[in-house]
């Protein structure tokens, strides 16, 4: 007689992106694949090789599973803050007996997608308090990846009425903890100008005076999701 075999049928967190440092409700459905023999005294143990997936309850017991029947393991799963951003295996170890009392073992594995939260800062950008029309000035900005995963296509743009950057600062890919730095040359026009080379017909009050604007930081994570941050 073939011994009854236990398989993992479904995992409630499969296909989801799990953020490091967060908690999730986990349900694992197990199925006895034998059509005529039951499984008895089943112990299920959950484990992660790198201790990055931490179940609140690491084991579960089921007195029996009927032929073709199922059992569901339910527990809260904590994702370690230090977990690497990657597909991480959650392992299930089975210890049970068949209906004749013969000891059996088995194992299953499911991959869970762990992601790190993004973190980024801009600093160091300054211009003189007074700028003169028709001048070209330069500004430098630093971008720091404060998270634990790479960021891609990191770019900073300046948006201020009357100031026209000749280029944006493109930092490209920033690894975790890495700093990117770049400068932009900025043409100083007038407050009412919409584009470089456009003649200004406004009064002095319309052309000159205080202006306010922002730096716009854009970047992508490893999954291609785009983020925007303003300062």
Residue ranges and their predicted role:
Residues 54-81, 163-201:
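Intrinsically disordered, low-complexity Pro/Gly/Ser/Thr-rich segments with frequent PxxP/GP/PP motifs
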Residues 1, 81-113, 188-231:
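Terminal connector regions
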Residues 20-36, 129-150:
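Short beta-strand elements of extracellular/lumenal beta-sandwich folds
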Residues 21-27, 71-73, 87-90, 134-140, ...:
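Short, solvent-exposed loop/turn segments enriched in Ser/Thr/Gly
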Residues 42-46, 155-158, 215:
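Hydrophobic beta-strand segments
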Residues 1-18, 51, 109-132, 163:
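Low-complexity, acidic Ser/Thr/Pro/Gly-rich terminal tails and inter-domain linkers that flank the onset
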Residues 47-56, 99-101, 152, 160-169:
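Short aromatic-acidic-glycine turn motif
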Residues 36-41, 87, 148-153, 227:
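Short acidic/proline- and small/hydrophobic-mixed sequence motifs that coincide with surface turns
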């Amino acid at each position: 007689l073939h011994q009854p075999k236990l398989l993992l049928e479904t995992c409630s967190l499969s296909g989801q992106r799990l953020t490091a440092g967060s908690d999730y409700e986990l349900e694992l459905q197990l199925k006895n694949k034998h059509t005529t023999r039951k499984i008895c005294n089943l112990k299920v143990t959950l484990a992660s090789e790198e201790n990055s997936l931490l179940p609140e309850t690491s084991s579960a017991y089921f007195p029996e599973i009927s032929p073709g029947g199922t059992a569901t393991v339910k527990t809260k799963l904590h994702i370690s803050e230090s977990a690497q951003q990657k597909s991480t295996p959650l392992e299930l170890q089975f210890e049970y007996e068949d209906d004749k009392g013969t000891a059996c073992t088995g194992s299953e594995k499911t991959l869970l997608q762990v992601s790190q939260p993004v973190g980024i800062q801009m600093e160091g950008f300054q211009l003189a308090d007074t700028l003169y029309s028709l001048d070209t000035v330069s500004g430098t900005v630093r971008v720091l990846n404060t998270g634990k995963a790479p960021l891609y296509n990191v770019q900073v743009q300046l948006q201020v009425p009357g100031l026209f950057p000749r280029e944006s600062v493109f930092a490209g890919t920033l690894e975790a903890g890495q700093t990117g730095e770049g400068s932009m040359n900025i043409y100083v026009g007038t407050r009412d100008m919409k584009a470089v080379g456009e003649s200004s017909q406004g009064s002095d009050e319309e052309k000159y005076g205080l202006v306010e604007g922002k730096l716009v930081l854009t970047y992508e994570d490893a999954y291609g999701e785009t983020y925007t941050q303003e300062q």
